[in-house]
Amino acid sequence: MDTNYIIETKNLTKQYGSQKSVADLNIHVKRGRIYGLLGRNGAGKTTTMKMLLGLTNPTSGEVKIWGKPLQGNEKKLLPRIGSLIESPGFYPNLTGTENLRIFATLRGVPNNHAIKDALDLVGLPYKDKKLFSQYSLGMKQRLATALAVMHDPELLILDEPINGLDPIGIAEVRSFIRELCDARGKTILISSHILSEISLLADDIGIIDHGALLEEESLAELEQKSSKHIRFTLSDTAQAARILERNFHENHFSIQDDHNLRLHNLDLPVGKIVTAFVENGLEVSEAATSEESLEDYFKRVTGGEGIA
């Protein structure tokens, strides 16, 4: 496994009875980047994150973090990770700061500065008399995120951190997550079912559906797949690719399957390309300009609705 990956899984599987919640998952989270795990509700995102944190054991497969197997190295690896999985058990009759002080004591976080820094980062006041029971859902989500970053972890694993937030809160969360990565060098794995937010935040995206990883690419690569292009339907895409490279010195294309190829350079003369294909024995049934939105692309890949 590549040491450039902070998280790497190999055939990670979780099975309950005859039902596979996660099936042969291979994800690769690169150092210093934000990885967005995107999928509809029930796709297997939370189960995957729980296995990455040792909260549930995989049925089969392997998790490596910083190049080391998680199993057997939990005491060394897990203290370097901050996580937000479901809702932490905060005390309702204490303030946010008082709650964090208790967790800081349990975790050996040395001083109040770490608590204040975490609260500042998520936009909650350090000196506040409001009890946790009086918090809105959005404030509770912010406090949970503050708890995840309080001990200054190298890696953050955040399950749906924007749940319950209003648009302003979502923008603020997006901003501080980006800051954690860009200014503080954190590696971040974040899950969501909201495509628009993942596409604004993530450097790399993994699409998960019914427990299986359907795609794993950089955001730029996925945007290229969904951008305006010329679609060719023909008898042999491998041969078509060779013709494009040899005759037109062009490699800005993507092969979809044996019979469908997308050319992303719209400046090339389509007529001459079709002629070259035919002269080299290819049967061309379609050559058309096409455009697919990123949302349409994700819906096509996952086979339907469920991603906002």
Model features per residue range: what roles?
Residues T13, T97, L121, L195, ...:
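Alpha-helix N-cap/helix-start and coil->helix boundary motif
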Residues D2, T95, G138, E223-K225, ...:
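Short coil/turn motifs at beta-sheet boundaries
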Residues M1-Y5, G304-A308:
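Short, Lys/Arg-enriched, disordered terminal segments
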Residues L78, L100-R101, K116-L119, A171, ...:
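Generic structural signal for individual residues within well-ordered alpha-helical segments
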Residues S175-H264:
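ABC transporter nucleotide-binding domain
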Residues T105-G108, G303-I307:
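Non-catalytic alpha-helical coupling and interface elements of nucleotide-dependent molecular machines
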Residues K228-V301, A308:
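Short, charged/small-residue-rich alpha-helical element at the C-terminal edge
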Residues N4-T9, K14-I190, L195-D209, L213-E215:
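ABC transporter nucleotide-binding domains
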